[in-house]
Amino acid sequence: MEFAGIMHGLGVYVTIFERDDKVLRGFDEDIRDFLVAEMIKKGIKFMPNTHVDRIEQIDAGFTMHTTAGETVTTDLVMYATGCVPNTKNLGLENLGVALDKVSAIIVNKDYKTNVPSIYALSDVTNRVNLTPVATAEGMFLVNKLYANKAGNVDYENIPTAVFSQPSIGTVGLTEAQAREKFSDIDVYKTDFKPMKNTLSGSSERTFMKMLVVRSTDKVVGMHMVGPEAGEIIQGFAVAIRAGATKAIFDNTIGIHPTAAEEFEIGRAHV
């Protein structure tokens, strides 16, 4: 999704083939729908539920053949169908290091493998594959081994961004996860055109969503699609981790004119 936005911004006609009915599996459903709608407005084409059977190189580029019998001719193909831990050719099998079915290194809560002298962390363990998480895991392990400091990395409420165009920022539970975990979820969301887009004539809109446990008033999820979504959600991630309630958000005075203030004043209960 990120490279689709980059290439489109450089003037390339972009078509996204997606095996599922939607892109960005695991993200909040509203976020997935809103992003695709905005990207379509920009001129990016989506082909959901499409499986590529083969890619044929021709004089003018490539022809994509789908299992449904469709063909699409293009200048270039970026083939990105997922990723697996890059643990091949490390000699792990010679050392007896245990791997799971996707070749991720199996570790315990202290990042120790089944071989006592070998530790592993970050993407090769296939847990939360984000750079800041890798940094946190590395610092934890160094402190535990060499500074005798206790503690563990907390994998809940890790903020995440997708630098698509428009970008995504998210922290906490999706609506589906929240409804599975709690019986009383209130949903607040807003869809608006930021002031700078109104003045510039841009049609790009921004979407924000907040999930609240009704019985405790605790905010358990915040999601956004729009300019600087990652920058905005990073700040709110602190509030989520601190256990902020909706009342705290409601009583916080926002900065005007900003998009972020809509998380305080502009949400509609649905």
Predicted regions and their residues:
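Short, surface-exposed charged micro-motifs
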Residues: R54, G96, D110, K209-L211
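Hydrophobic alpha-helical segments, especially N-terminal targeting/anchoring helices
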Residues: F17, H65, L99, V107, ...
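FAD-site-proximal beta/loop scaffold in flavoenzymes
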Residues: T71-A147
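Flexible, glycine-rich terminal cap/loop adjacent to redox cofactors
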Residues: A147, F163-R267
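A short alpha-helix-loop-beta-strand transition element characteristic
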Residues: A98-K101, N148-N157, D184-Y188
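Rossmann-like dinucleotide-binding cores of NAD(P)H-dependent redox enzymes
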Residues: F3-T63, T67, R127-T135, N143-Q177
